[in-house]
Every structure is written in structure tokens, then in C-alpha cells.
Amino acid sequence: MFTELLFIVSFVLLLRLFKSSRSRMIIGVLYSLLLVWFIFSVLNYGKYTLQPGQSVNLRVNPRTQDLEYYSIFILKKNDSGRIKLTGSSVWSERNGDVYYGVEEQKIIKSHGLDEEDEELPNKQVDIYLEKDGVVVSYQGEKVFDATNNKPYTITITNVDKKPAQFEAQVVDK
């Protein structure tokens, strides 16, 4: 809100200050380019293309000052390339019953309080464990639980042989 207001006020003040048509045309072109750049950057927020071996870091800053807080990590993959997620010791889908324990190297399916948990083999097609994270190769959108009581960084690395395109976002509520 403040950025838009500053943009409009400075534009009006500059137009009032410069009276020649050439100056006003230059100001109009520069502000139009700035507006196009701003809209383009807002529309592409959270969209990434990583070459093989490249990484991107996303910061999780939990709102621990709130009584009820949680963080989610939204990952929408546009292709079936493999990317590795590191930074958390346990990965799980939001409201899911399968937990990927990175430190223990175990995939656990929870059956609630009544039954005993079941250990699944590490041969899942879409998501599987590696020594320091989980590798995901699904196509589509998944929401992971990223709640923790301390800030940390999620690192996304392209471990495939081709470029990977995805959208990633951390939401702290």
C-alpha cells in the first residue's frame, strides 16, 4: 500500500515540477517501465528455475510470539524433475499421516492413537529419503508442515540432470 502511494505521489509531484512536454514524456516512460517491472516481479514471486546442482534457500520465521502459530511450505512442481529438500529433520504433508524422518532414515505411517505406527519402505515413487533430506519428483502441488519453534532455512536443490521449474513459498501464520 505504501509503495503504490509513494509511486503515485512522486509521479504527480514530478509532473508538476517539470513543465516541458519532453521532460514529461521521459518521466512517463520511466514510470511506465518501473510499473511494468513492479507488476512483473509481483507476478513471478516464488517462481524458480534451477539448473542441475543449483540451490535456493527459503527462510522459515515462525511467529512464536503468537499463542497458536504454524508455518507451511507450499511446493508446486511444474515438471517431474527431482529436487531435494533439506533443512528439517522431519518432513510431512500438512494434515497427512506419513512422516519422513531424515535423521532416523525412516518413513512412518501414523494410524492415530489407537493403533501402532507402521514403517514404510524407502521406495516411494514421488517422495523418498536421502541421507540429508527428502527427494521429491511428483508433479503438482503439495503443502508441507514447516512448523518449528526456531527460525531455520529450507534449501531446495536440483538433483536431476535437467533444469527444474517450480513455485515455492513459506507462509508463517
Model-inferred region functions:
Residues 1, 172-173:
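Short, solvent-exposed mixed-charge patches
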Residues 81-84, 160-172:
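Edge beta-strands of jelly-roll/beta-sandwich modules across compartments, strongly enriched
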Residues 24-45:
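Internal/C-terminal transmembrane anchor helices
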Residues 62-121:
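Extracytoplasmic/periplasmic/luminal assembly and interaction segments
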Residues 1-17:
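Membrane-embedded alpha-helical segments of integral membrane proteins
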Residues 45-63:
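Alpha-helical transmembrane signal-anchor/signal-peptide segments
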